[in-house]
Regions:
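A structural connector/turn signal
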Residues: 22, 68, 73-74
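Low-complexity, highly charged intrinsically disordered N-terminal segments
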Residues: 1-48
Length: 242
C-alpha cells in the first residue's frame, strides 16, 4: 500500500489526457499537424496515411474513450529491474496503432521510478547503519530514518512539474522535503488534506551572509531567538564552519 493509492500512473492520465476521452478537435488538430510535417519532407504528392476513420470510430463507438487496457505494478511496489512495469493492450483490432500513441507518455514513469528507487536504496543503507551504531530498533529506527534524507530537489530539476513528480516519489520513502509542489500534487490528486511530508525552519546562505562575516554568530543567535523551541537548520558554510 503506497501513500498514493493503488491505481498505477493515475497522475499521468488525469494531468495529460483530461477526462481520458478524445474529442473531435483533438484529432482534427493532429491531422493538420501531421499533414504539415508531411509536406515539409517533400512527400506532399503522396496522401498522408492519417487514421481518420479510426479516430472517428473511437468517437462514435466509444464516445471518445480509448479502447485500451493498461495494467501496471501498483504504485510503491518494489520489483526487480527485469519485471514488466506496464502492459498496454488494444481491445479493438480496427485501431491497432493506438497502443503506440501512448508509449511516450507512459515512459514518463521512469523519472519517479528512478527517484523512488534511489531514495529507497539510501534508506536501506541508513537503516543498516542505524541498527549497527545506535540503540534504536523497530519503531525507533522507522521514526528517525524517515527524516534522514531531506528533499531539496526543486532547484535541481527542469520544471515545476518535474519537481512535483520527483518529490511525490521521494516521500514514499521519507517524510522530509522542502519541495512543496510535490506535497500539493499528492494532496490534490489523492484528495486529502493530510500532511504527507514535513520540514523545519531553516536558514539559507543569504540570511547568514547579510549579517556579514564578523556577525555570523549573531545570525545564528537570531535564529535561536526566532525559534526558541523545536528544531532549526542552519547552513554552516556561508563563510566558514563555526
Amino acid at each position: 500500500q503506497s501513500l498514493y493509492g493503488n491505481e498505477p500512473n493515475q497522475y499521468l492520465f488525469t494531468w495529460r489526457t483530461g477526462d481520458n476521452t478524445l474529442v473531435l478537435n483533438d484529432y482534427s488538430r493532429a491531422q493538420r499537424f501531421a499533414w504539415y510535417l508531411w509536406d515539409q519532407f517533400g512527400i506532399g504528392g503522396t496522401p498522408y496515411p492519417f487514421p481518420y476513420e479510426g479516430f472517428q470510430k473511437i468517437i462514435d463507438k466509444y464516445k471518445g474513450a480509448l479502447p485500451i487496457t493498461i495494467k501496471a505494478v501498483p504504485e510503491g511496489t518494489s520489483v526487480k529491474t527485469s519485471n514488466v512495469l506496464i502492459t498496454v493492450e488494444n481491445t479493438d483490432p480496427e485501431v491497432p496503432w493506438l497502443t503506440n500513441y501512448l508509449e511516450s507518455i507512459l515512459l514518463q514513469v521512469w523519472y519517479p521510478t528512478t527517484v523512488g528507487t534511489l531514495s529507497r536504496e539510501i534508506k536501506k543503507l541508513l537503516v543498516t547503519y542505524l541498527k549497527k551504531t545506535t540503540s534504536y530498533d523497530g519503531d525507533g529506527v522507522k521514526n528517525i530514518v524517515s527524516f534522514m534524507l531531506h528533499d531539496f530537489g526543486f532547484r535541481g530539476v527542469s520544471s515545476v512539474e518535474s519537481s512535483a513528480i520527483g518529490c511525490s516519489a521521494h516521500i514514499v520513502n521519507f517524510l522530509g522535503t522542502d519541495t512543496v509542489s510535490g506535497i500539493l500534487l499528492a494532496q490534490d490528486y489523492y484528495n486529502t488534506d493530510n500532511m504527507l511530508a514535513f520540514s523545519i525552519p531553516a536558514s539559507e546562505h543569504s540570511t547568514i551572509t547579510s549579517w556579514t562575516e564578523p556577525f555570523e554568530v549573531k545570525a545564528m543567535e537570531n535564529m535561536l531567538d526566532q525559534y526558541p523551541t523545536g528544531l532549526v537548520a542552519c547552513v554552516s558554510d556561508s563563510f566558514d564552519i563555526i
